[in-house]
Amino acid sequence: MSLPTYSKLNIVILAAGKGTRMNSSKPKVLHALAGKPVLQHVLDTARRLNPSSIIVVYGFGGEIVPQALPADDIIWVKQAEQLGTGHAMQQALPYLEPDARTLILLGDVPLLTQESCTQLLTQQAALCLLTVSKDNPSGYGRIVRQGDAVKAIVEHKDAAEAQLAIREVNTGIMAAENTWLATWLPRLDNRNAQQEYYLTDIVAMAVADGQAVAAVQSNDEWQVAGINSKQDLAALERVYQGRYAARLLAKGVTLADPSRIDVRGELTTGRDVEIDVGCVFEGQVTLADNVRIGPYCVIRDATIGAGTTLAAYTHIDGATLAEDCRIGPYARLRPGTVLSDHAHIGNFVELKNAQVDSGSKINHLSYVGDATVGKQVNIGAGTITCNYDGVNKFRTVIEDNAFIGSDSQLVAPVTIKAGATIAAGSTITEDAPADKLTMSRVRQFTIENWKRPEKVKK
């Protein structure tokens, strides 16, 4: 009998486990991989399959998991007691649509791809398993076959000696018709060494009911690897980063050392981009053509224009840089900062919510916050925009072609008019007129007969 074609897809993600070996009070599915929770990776894959519903079964940690990942398209189902994967699916059963298929994913298997899920779902069988062959299958449920047909999955602790020699193992990921799940799940029991309700027992039920059980064997062990310890988490992090680096190299990005780059979000690159060692990219980052990133830079939610260079140890967060800018080393650009073409921001300069127009330079040891800087402005070393009175923040405006001498304090709200020059060491509290020299400093004088104090002998 041919199997029906289902237009609806339910996805159930099992995410109730404690993860004892993580040695953490945090549910293991909330630990970060590449900058986002492990469970978020699984949710992202699930959403790409366009299911009619996503059901997440959670348990350990209580409401921490749904609170950490709020979303309108998720049905959260609590497994109050963690009594096994079969018990978890029993909790999800009332939310499954009768005329749909269900894809069962694991919340601690973050590298599974959409392609593998699709391959599983296209199998014409009431039940289909995703399996993998392991050199060391210890701890995994063994796939027991009769010829090519899957007859059962035997958990490691329940396996006979001959079954322990089997290398093909269950990944825990499967797809099934909901009409059959409604028949099999209520029949599960906990008569086994672990006294848990094994979801894998539905394989034997399917065979007993005369239903063929299909299996798709993955050739990528990492793609189906779960996280049970910090060692597992660290290993998968390096796999993820290594694969991301390989994709960047394939696009033509030059990486000084592919093993020393971390992407914790999405990195979009143009042509002839160069990235030195130790760089971290977080959130949504875009690097246009011919961008050069020096060693140990951290870039978060930023757009870097063509031809721009970031020297070593530069931090960019929530900023937009236009073309041919020169930044760093040791510069920090905070959220709201926008640089126009050919801006220069030098060492130990911090910008926050500052707009710097084309050709302007802030080359040394300065803080410019809540400021608008015009074209061709030069801001000397040690300049500070004093933007905060302890309660409110105020804005500084520096118009085109102004020159700010070193060690100046601009007390906002204040405007430095076009072409104005501020003498070094000035504290400016009022607007400075255009094309004039403004200064505010104590007159220098010398005490002729002064002597240094002498040390008192005790």
From Swiss-Prot:
Pathway as given in its UniProt record: Nucleotide-sugar biosynthesis; UDP-N-acetyl-alpha-D-glucosamine biosynthesis; N-acetyl-alpha-D-glucosamine 1-phosphate from alpha-D-glucosamine 6-phosphate (route II): step 2/2; Nucleotide-sugar biosynthesis; UDP-N-acetyl-alpha-D-glucosamine biosynthesis; UDP-N-acetyl-alpha-D-glucosamine from N-acetyl-alpha-D-glucosamine 1-phosphate: step 1/1; Bacterial outer membrane biogenesis; LPS lipid A biosynthesis
Record EC number: 2.7.7.23, 2.3.1.157
Region (Linker): 231-251
Gene Ontology CC: one annotated term: membrane
SUPFAM superfamilies: Nucleotide-diphospho-sugar transferases (SSF53448), Trimeric LpxA-like enzymes (SSF51161)
Class of this enzyme: transferase
Keywords annotated in UniProt: Acyltransferase, Cell shape, Cell wall biogenesis/degradation, Cytoplasm, Magnesium, Metal-binding, Multifunctional enzyme, Nucleotidyltransferase, Peptidoglycan synthesis, Repeat, Transferase
Domain of life: Bacteria
Positions of UDP-N-acetyl-alpha-D-glucosamine binding: 14-17, 28, 79, 84-85, 141, 155, 170, 228, 334, 352, 367, 378
Swiss-Prot/TrEMBL cofactor(s): Mg(2+)
UniProt-annotated stretches for the region Pyrophosphorylase: 1-230
Localisation: Cytoplasm
Native organism taxonomy: Bacteria, Pseudomonadati, Pseudomonadota, Betaproteobacteria, Nitrosomonadales
Ranges where the record places region N-acetyltransferase: 252-458
Role: Catalyzes the last two sequential reactions in the de novo biosynthetic pathway for UDP-N-acetylglucosamine (UDP-GlcNAc). The C-terminal domain catalyzes the transfer of acetyl group from acetyl coenzyme A to glucosamine-1-phosphate (GlcN-1-P) to produce N-acetylglucosamine-1-phosphate (GlcNAc-1-P), which is converted into UDP-GlcNAc by the transfer of uridine 5-monophosphate (from uridine 5-triphosphate), a reaction catalyzed by the N-terminal domain.
Cofactor note as given: Binds 1 Mg(2+) ion per subunit.
Reactions listed under catalytic activity: alpha-D-glucosamine 1-phosphate + acetyl-CoA = N-acetyl-alpha-D-glucosamine 1-phosphate + CoA + H(+); N-acetyl-alpha-D-glucosamine 1-phosphate + UTP + H(+) = UDP-N-acetyl-alpha-D-glucosamine + diphosphate
GO BP annotations, alphabetical order: cell morphogenesis; cell wall organization; lipid A biosynthetic process; peptidoglycan biosynthetic process; regulation of cell shape; UDP-N-acetylglucosamine biosynthetic process
Annotated positions binding acetyl-CoA: 381, 387-388, 406, 424, 441
UniProt-annotated catalytic positions: 364
Family as reported in the entry's similarity comment: In the N-terminal section; belongs to the N-acetylglucosamine-1-phosphate uridyltransferase family. In the C-terminal section; belongs to the transferase hexapeptide repeat family.
PANTHER family the record matches: BIFUNCTIONAL PROTEIN GLMU (PTHR43584:SF3), NUCLEOTIDYL TRANSFERASE (PTHR43584)
GO molecular function, one term: glucosamine-1-phosphate N-acetyltransferase activity
Protein name: Bifunctional protein GlmU
